[in-house]
Amino acid sequence: MLAINLNLTVAFMLALTGVLVYRSHLMSTLLCLEGMMLSLFILMTLLIVHFHMFSMSMAPLILLVFSACEAGVGLALLVKISSTHGNDYVQNLNLLQC
């Protein structure tokens, strides 16, 4: 169990590092955020089963729902930005400009 938790923690940290390194492209940032959410979902599920906290069994499902909503909003934002600006560079965006 310890090796699985360590692997999932390393996967979460790698995805977090990817968010910090690839923050200039929106698509790469969204993929790294999805990796973070997936590793967090699996880690929460394994910890709940391991410690027999069945009262918290809905928490991973709620996290998965929010992750799906985040992915949908992120992809809609990516499509909108790509159609208006022609690329997904976050550096070229000025959010104060309408």
Swiss-Prot record:
It comes from the Eukaryota. Gene3D superfamilies: 1.10.287.3510. Keywords: Electron transport, Membrane, Mitochondrion, Mitochondrion inner membrane, NAD, Respiratory chain, Translocase, Transmembrane, Transmembrane helix, Transport, Ubiquinone. InterPro entries: NADH_UbQ_OxRdtase_chain4L/K (IPR001133), NUOK/Mnh_C1-like (IPR039428). GO terms for biological process: ATP synthesis coupled electron transport. It catalyses: a ubiquinone + NADH + 5 H(+)(in) = a ubiquinol + NAD(+) + 4 H(+)(out). Its EC number is 7.1.1.2. One of its GO terms (molecular function) is NADH dehydrogenase (ubiquinone) activity. It is found in: Mitochondrion inner membrane. The keyword Transmembrane applies. GO terms for cellular component: mitochondrial inner membrane; respiratory chain complex I. Its main location: mitochondrion. Core subunit of respiratory chain NADH dehydrogenase (Complex I) which is composed of 45 different subunits. Belongs to the complex I subunit 4L family. Core subunit of the mitochondrial membrane respiratory chain NADH dehydrogenase (Complex I) which catalyzes electron transfer from NADH through the respiratory chain, using ubiquinone as an electron acceptor. Part of the enzyme membrane arm which is embedded in the lipid bilayer and involved in proton translocation. This is NADH-ubiquinone oxidoreductase chain 4L.
